[in-house]
């Protein structure tokens, strides 16, 4: 579903529904809006907004998903790519593939992101180890990791804010 059920409201940033919508419609519209906020060329200036968009995109998956937010030298979005899908409590992430995608998109920096289907965004030791492994691999090709964000129903945790980068 696209935004065809929405009409612009009288106030900027508001919308009016022109037909009934389901909860699934609303969630899908929220995901489309979050994706548009992470569209190519947009500068990322507010970390909390970025976390909110990432949470909207990933929090409802029933399996773990690992993704990359690819950025240029001015930290403008090049793209958002879901790279790996796993099980309820893990996903296999291959550093070679992460580096390959970063190079294919000529990314100067990336934000790593994955969800915890349990809803608890607290990073595991495996998450911290993966961050270090990917940081080393990406540094070798001149790509900086700005953050690794873990998403859950209960919120987002930034490994950068925790000093784990």
Language-model regions, residue ranges each:
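Active-site-proximal loop/helix of nucleotide/amide-processing enzymes and allied scaffolds
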Residues: 2-27, 32, 52, 74, ...
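Long amphipathic N-terminal alpha/beta scaffold segment
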Residues: 23-82
């Amino acid at each position: 579903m696209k935004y065809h059920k929405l009409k612009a409201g009288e106030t900027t940033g508001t919308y009016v529904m022109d037909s009934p919508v389901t909860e699934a419609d609303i969630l899908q519209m929220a995901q489309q809006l979050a994706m548009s906020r992470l569209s190519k060329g947009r500068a990322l200036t507010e970390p909390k907004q970025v976390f909110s968009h990432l949470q909207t995109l990933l929090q409802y998956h029933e399996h773990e998903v690992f993704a990359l937010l690819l950025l240029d030298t001015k930290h403008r979005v090049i793209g958002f790519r879901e790279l790996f899908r796993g099980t309820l409590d893990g996903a296999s992430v291959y550093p070679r593939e992460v580096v390959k995608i970063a190079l294919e998109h000529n990314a100067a920096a990336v934000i790593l992101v994955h969800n915890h289907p349990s809803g608890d965004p607290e990073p595991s030791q495996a998450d911290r180890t993966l961050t270090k492994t990917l940081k080393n691999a990406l540094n070798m090709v001149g790509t900086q990791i700005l953050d690794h964000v873990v998403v859950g129903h209960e919120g987002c945790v930034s490994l950068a804010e925790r000093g784990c980068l």
